[in-house]
Amino acid sequence: MNETIQNLITRRSVRSYSNKRIPDDVLDQILDAGSYAPSGMNKQSAVMVVLRDRDRISDISFLNAKVMGTDSDPFYGAPVVVVVFADSRVPTYVEDGSLVMGNLMNAAHALGVDSCWIHRAREVFSTPVGKDIMKKWGLDENYVGIGNCILGYSDKPVPDAKSRKGGNVIFEHH
């Protein structure tokens, strides 16, 4: 099987991380792949904010948990969080940001790094506190949170994929 196809099929969402640091060169490759995601009319509306500082990750985790209505860590102890935003003035901003998220996760897997898409970025960064954080990052109110891509190395064996349910491909017959 083609290596790229195999990578797409074997990627899994990981929700338990060790403290092992992702080497800078590996993280740079993942982020570079994210920046090359397709975008509508090549507008490249998405922006990635990379968090490696434990305190900053904890701050954003707390806000995310608050939106979710829990006090558990929605980032599962991951040592890196990439918050993806996109400019809502671009008609395809949600799709653009989503493709960045996909590229980040697939590139991470190709390099032996685990990942998971964590939702609620839109809700977190719609709050007054979230908007203040965005301002500190140089993002104005036109940017909308698309997702949080957590990255790191699993502290448990990663399970194999569950079988696909089927019926998700329909061929038109003439």
Regions found by a protein language model. Give the residues of each.
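Acidic, surface-exposed loops and disordered segments
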Residues: M1-H174
